[in-house]
Amino acid sequence: MDAPRQVVNFGPGPAKLPHSVLLEIQKELLDYKGVGISVLEMSHRSSDFAKIINNTENLVRELLAVPDNYKVIFLQGGGCGQFSAVPLNLIGLKAGRCADYVVTGAWSAKAAEEAKKFGTINIVHPKLGSYTKIPDPSTWNLNPDASYVYYCANETVHGVEFDFIPDVKGAVLVCDMSSNFLSKPVDVSKFGVIFAGAQKNVGSAGVTVVIVRDDLLGFALRECPSVLEYKVQAGNSSLYNTPPCFSIYVMGLVLEWIKNNGGAAAMEKLSSIKSQTIYEIIDNSQGFYVCPVEPQNRSKMNIPFRIGNAKGDDALEKRFLDKALELNMLSLKGHRSVGGIRASLYNAVTIEDVQKLAAFMKKFLEMHQL
């Protein structure tokens, strides 16, 4: 029963969960802590579920040292729901209904496009020819009248990650941290809003955690749906509508696992070791493996690369994926919009998992070098 799974899951999200968490879920699935029912069938207004959601919130607060003047809420709709919720809640902070967006990849581009429905959106830098770097912040053209400045901390499709918090001159800073949430410590006080879908680093699909500063509540546009309104959800302790109870429970278990394994700082150390292992193989492959991202902006979470040359050799990449599958390594195919290969190294992916991939990459390189 306790034998580790032989399959290695490099999925970009939903992603691997810690094995011990899966065993805990399995153990409690039919009868949660002796109450006689599963969390799957538990009333969201019961005292048992109140303990679950309070525990999950407290762990978020503890692991990120969330200041007291921030609310932590659990919503549905994923990151895409927040692409709408952010402007609906915040674009009315200033009369001009405008916002600044930093667009460094597919997800921030999507967020900016969605926000255009609700106001004027200023992309703070010239459009990038390719998503392979973060434009130098000294070149950003921030609008002093913007209600907020938005960026995505880690772009899962293109493998671009911020290793700094942008200085936005006192403006309200909003961050999509879906794919590097709790992979490293973060100074929450520098942000107005942080949101993250759980299904990458902190749980299973279905719940999105939103951390919002108290003074930003109450400015939603009149047309904002109540389920997306931060003030309504915070005022109802995330119970305005039936929340994704099971996903919140799973998230609590994963947060407990992160805490027991040294917290965000320990996750950061592991992320550096794991990502460095793969980037070193890519960089020492004499151009056989190619990562298009500028070294200083490379993601520790998602490593996209091509095989054979910078544009990718389709036959080689197919062979790589087929062989990886034979070795029980799953979900290494790049996002459909960019192709190639992508290894996602979220918190639950172990150093041993990464070493298996590294050994395979070295062997594949040896087999195909001229």
Swiss-Prot record:
<dbReference type="InterPro" id="IPR015421">
    <property type="entry name" value="PyrdxlP-dep_Trfase_major"/>
</dbReference>
<dbReference type="GO" id="GO:0042802">
    <property type="term" value="F:identical protein binding"/>
</dbReference>
<feature type="modified residue" description="N6-acetyllysine">
    <location>
        <position position="51"/>
    </location>
</feature>
<feature type="binding site">
    <location>
        <position position="336"/>
    </location>
    <ligand>
        <name>O-phospho-L-serine</name>
    </ligand>
</feature>
<feature type="modified residue" description="N6-acetyllysine">
    <location>
        <position position="269"/>
    </location>
</feature>
<keyword id="KW-0028">Amino-acid biosynthesis</keyword>
<protein>
    <recommendedName>
        <fullName>Phosphoserine aminotransferase</fullName>
        <ecNumber>2.6.1.52</ecNumber>
    </recommendedName>
</protein>
<dbReference type="GO" id="GO:0005737">
    <property type="term" value="C:cytoplasm"/>
</dbReference>
<feature type="binding site">
    <location>
        <position position="79"/>
    </location>
    <ligand>
        <name>pyridoxal 5'-phosphate</name>
    </ligand>
</feature>
<dbReference type="GO" id="GO:0070062">
    <property type="term" value="C:extracellular exosome"/>
</dbReference>
<feature type="modified residue" description="N6-(pyridoxal phosphate)lysine">
    <location>
        <position position="200"/>
    </location>
</feature>
<keyword id="KW-0225">Disease variant</keyword>
<dbReference type="GO" id="GO:0008615">
    <property type="term" value="P:pyridoxine biosynthetic process"/>
</dbReference>
<feature type="binding site">
    <location>
        <position position="80"/>
    </location>
    <ligand>
        <name>pyridoxal 5'-phosphate</name>
    </ligand>
</feature>
<dbReference type="GO" id="GO:0030170">
    <property type="term" value="F:pyridoxal phosphate binding"/>
</dbReference>
<feature type="binding site">
    <location>
        <position position="156"/>
    </location>
    <ligand>
        <name>pyridoxal 5'-phosphate</name>
    </ligand>
</feature>
<dbReference type="InterPro" id="IPR015424">
    <property type="entry name" value="PyrdxlP-dep_Trfase"/>
</dbReference>
<keyword id="KW-0663">Pyridoxal phosphate</keyword>
<comment type="subunit">
    <text>Homodimer.</text>
</comment>
<feature type="binding site">
    <location>
        <position position="342"/>
    </location>
    <ligand>
        <name>O-phospho-L-serine</name>
    </ligand>
</feature>
<dbReference type="InterPro" id="IPR000192">
    <property type="entry name" value="Aminotrans_V_dom"/>
</dbReference>
<feature type="modified residue" description="N-acetylmethionine">
    <location>
        <position position="1"/>
    </location>
</feature>
<feature type="binding site" description="in other chain">
    <location>
        <position position="44"/>
    </location>
    <ligand>
        <name>O-phospho-L-serine</name>
    </ligand>
</feature>
<feature type="modified residue" description="N6-acetyllysine">
    <location>
        <position position="318"/>
    </location>
</feature>
<feature type="binding site" description="in other chain">
    <location>
        <position position="241"/>
    </location>
    <ligand>
        <name>pyridoxal 5'-phosphate</name>
    </ligand>
</feature>
<comment type="similarity">
    <text>Belongs to the class-V pyridoxal-phosphate-dependent aminotransferase family. SerC subfamily.</text>
</comment>
<dbReference type="Pfam" id="PF00266">
    <property type="entry name" value="Aminotran_5"/>
</dbReference>
<keyword id="KW-0032">Aminotransferase</keyword>
<feature type="binding site">
    <location>
        <position position="199"/>
    </location>
    <ligand>
        <name>pyridoxal 5'-phosphate</name>
    </ligand>
</feature>
<dbReference type="InterPro" id="IPR020578">
    <property type="entry name" value="Aminotrans_V_PyrdxlP_BS"/>
</dbReference>
<feature type="binding site" description="in other chain">
    <location>
        <position position="45"/>
    </location>
    <ligand>
        <name>O-phospho-L-serine</name>
    </ligand>
</feature>
<keyword id="KW-0007">Acetylation</keyword>
<keyword id="KW-0808">Transferase</keyword>
<keyword id="KW-0597">Phosphoprotein</keyword>
<dbReference type="GO" id="GO:0005829">
    <property type="term" value="C:cytosol"/>
</dbReference>
<feature type="modified residue" description="N6-acetyllysine">
    <location>
        <position position="127"/>
    </location>
</feature>
<dbReference type="InterPro" id="IPR015422">
    <property type="entry name" value="PyrdxlP-dep_Trfase_small"/>
</dbReference>
<comment type="pathway">
    <text>Amino-acid biosynthesis; L-serine biosynthesis; L-serine from 3-phospho-D-glycerate: step 2/3.</text>
</comment>
<dbReference type="InterPro" id="IPR022278">
    <property type="entry name" value="Pser_aminoTfrase"/>
</dbReference>
<dbReference type="GO" id="GO:0006564">
    <property type="term" value="P:L-serine biosynthetic process"/>
</dbReference>
<comment type="function">
    <text>Involved in L-serine biosynthesis via the phosphorylated pathway, a three-step pathway converting the glycolytic intermediate 3-phospho-D-glycerate into L-serine. Catalyzes the second step, that is the pyridoxal 5'-phosphate-dependent transamination of 3-phosphohydroxypyruvate and L-glutamate to O-phosphoserine (OPS) and alpha-ketoglutarate.</text>
</comment>
<feature type="modified residue" description="Phosphoserine">
    <location>
        <position position="331"/>
    </location>
</feature>
